[in-house]
């Protein structure tokens, strides 16, 4: 079975306390679906080909369906509510090869 991934790029963060509240709720919600954080890049980032230096998070799930279910879960919705408008993000759910 192909794995599923969340690829999240933070375009801007306007409320660090909202982001911390989001992370406190999102992490256990993601892990309850077997999600594993591959990177939470706040350190070294090298960009190429018109890329933007954005905080990027990659989470791996055992399947695309689990990745989608985690995003649609009640626990993760509560995390999104805590984040509110504290960050502008590009959030993608993709299937591995």
Show the residue positions of the predicted features.
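C-terminal structural segments of small proteins and small subunits
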Residues: 67-92
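Short S/T/G/P-rich N-terminal loop/turn motif that feeds into the first structured element of a domain
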Residues: 1-55, 62-68, 72, 95-97
């Amino acid at each position: 079975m192909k794995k599923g991934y969340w690829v999240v790029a933070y375009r801007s963060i306007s409320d660090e306390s909202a982001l911390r509240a989001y992370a406190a709720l999102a992490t256990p919600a993601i892990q309850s679906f077997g999600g594993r954080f591959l990177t939470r890049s706040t350190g070294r980032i090298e960009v190429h080909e018109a890329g933007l230096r954005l905080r990027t998070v990659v989470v791996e799930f055992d399947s695309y369906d689990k990745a989608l279910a985690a995003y649609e879960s009640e626990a993760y919705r509560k995390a999104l509510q805590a984040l509110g408008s504290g960050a502008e993000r590009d959030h993608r759910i993709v299937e591995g090869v």
